[in-house]
Structure formats: C-alpha cells, structure tokens
C-alpha cells in the first residue's frame, strides 16, 4: 500500500481504532463459515489494512432492499468492493436475483462462482464470463477516498452497468462522483459497524428509495 493510499483510507475514531487493534492482537482471523451462516454480515472479519469497514446491519439491509428494488425482478446485481451488501442480498434469499461480489480479498472466494477477483488498479481485468453492460445495477464502495481510486472504480462501474449505479463513498467525494458517474447524493446516511471519523454518503443516478424516509 502506498503512502498516499494510506492517507486516503477512511479513518476510524481513536477510541474505535484502539479497540480494533486490541481485537486483532487477541484473536486470529479465521474463515470457516458454513451453510447459511456464511452470508452473515461480519462473518468474515474486517481487515482495516485493506480499508475494510463493514456496514451496520441496518445499513446493509437498507442498501440490499434498495438494490433489489432497483434491479427489478430477476435482476442482475454487481457488488463492487461492497461485500456487506452482497452478504445481505444473499441472506435475504432472493433466488430470482443474480448477484456477484467483485472483491480483492480472496477470503470471499468462499462464495464460489459468484466471487470475482477484482483489483481497482486494473479496472477492466475481469473474466470473459463477465460481459459488458450485463448488470441491471452496480453497487460500489471504493476502498479509498481518493480521486484515483474513484476514477478507476468508475471505469469498472461503467463497464458493468446497463445504467443504474448506487455508489457509497465519502461526502468529500461528491463533486468527483458527480463528474465521473453523474450521480447525486441521497438523503439516506449509511452507517458502519465501527464508527468512522469520515462522513459517508450514498449516491445514485436514478430516483431511489434512499431519498425517502426509512
């Protein structure tokens, strides 16, 4: 990870960071979920060195429901660097929806053929089975709060989507997100399971339920 990338990682509050460091010092991370449990949000522990910060249960549920509504019946959904949303979608057992997780962390390969290894530094290096403009909705949460990361992730988003985009990133990225993807900030404010010092927001390029009251 470069020094600039380190600066762009969403920041934990000092109290949360201390607790998280203590947690990692005391426990080994292991991935051995089975059955339906493997779709529980948080079953795979955050690795904050990879800038992983999972959504709260309520936020993951709200975003998953929005994704289902936006994609429509039988819709195809791509979750780009947004594993919490993928897990909640699969936890909801919507078998009529096709959902894929695009993720750098190979621990998520437990999800079989729905896992697509993804490195935002190579935004278009995707398997041949992933066709251009083959997803009704792309949900994306770029790992770093930088123009470079958002720009490269945007290339992936534009390749994958048939039109609809749901982006989750820092409030400070609003202008760049609008320029790159034509998205607007929603009223809904996402929350993470661990408190972040950065303000996060959701953005869409369509009329979404995230502008309505919960």
Curated annotation (Swiss-Prot):
Keywords, comma-separated and alphabetical: Acetylation, Cytoplasm, Methyltransferase, Phosphoprotein, Transferase
Presence of keyword Nuclease: no
InterPro entries in alphabetical order: DNA_methylase_N6_adenine_CS, Efm5/EEF1AKMT1, Mlase_EEF1AKMT1/ZCCHC4, SAM-dependent_MTases_sf
Molecular function in Gene Ontology: methyltransferase activity; nucleic acid binding; protein-lysine N-methyltransferase activity
Catalytic activity: L-lysyl-[protein] + 3 S-adenosyl-L-methionine = N(6),N(6),N(6)-trimethyl-L-lysyl-[protein] + 3 S-adenosyl-L-homocysteine + 3 H(+)
Subcellular location: Cytoplasm
GO biological process: peptidyl-lysine methylation
EC number: 2.1.1.-
Domain of life: Eukaryota
Broad class of enzyme this protein falls into: transferase
Modified-residue entries (N-acetylserine), positions: 2
Annotated positions of the Phosphoserine modification: 2
GO CC terms of this entry: cytoplasm
Pfam families in UniProt: N6-adenineMlase
Family per record: Belongs to the class I-like SAM-binding methyltransferase superfamily. EFM5 family.
HAMAP family: Methyltr_EFM5 (MF_03187)
Function recorded in the entry: Protein-lysine methyltransferase that selectively catalyzes the trimethylation of EEF1A at 'Lys-79'.
Protein name: EEF1A lysine methyltransferase 1
């Amino acid at each position: 990870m470069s020094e600039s990338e380190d600066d762009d990682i969403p920041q934990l509050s000092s109290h949360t960071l201390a607790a998280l460091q203590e947690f990692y010092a005391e426990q080994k991370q292991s991935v051995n979920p089975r059955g339906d449990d493997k779709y529980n949000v948080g079953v795979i522990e955050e690795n904050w060195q990879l800038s992983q910060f999972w959504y709260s249960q309520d936020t993951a549920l709200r975003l998953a429901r929005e994704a289902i509504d936006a994609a429509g019946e039988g819709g195809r959904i791509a979750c780009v660097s947004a594993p919490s949303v993928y897990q909640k979608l699969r936890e909801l057992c919507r078998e009529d929806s096709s959902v894929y997780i695009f993720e750098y962390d190979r621990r998520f390969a437990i999800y079989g053929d729905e896992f697509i290894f993804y490195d935002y530094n190579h935004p278009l290096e995707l398997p041949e089975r992933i066709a251009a403009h083959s997803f009704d909705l792309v949900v994306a949460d770029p790992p770093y709060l930088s123009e470079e990361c958002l720009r490269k992730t945007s290339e992936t988003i534009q390749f994958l989507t048939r039109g609809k985009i749901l982006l989750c990133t820092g409030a400070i990225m609003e202008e760049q997100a609008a320029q790159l993807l034509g998205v607007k900030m929603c009223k809904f404010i996402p929350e993470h399971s661990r408190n972040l010092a950065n303000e996060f927001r959701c953005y869409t390029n369509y009329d979404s339920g995230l502008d309505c009251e919960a």
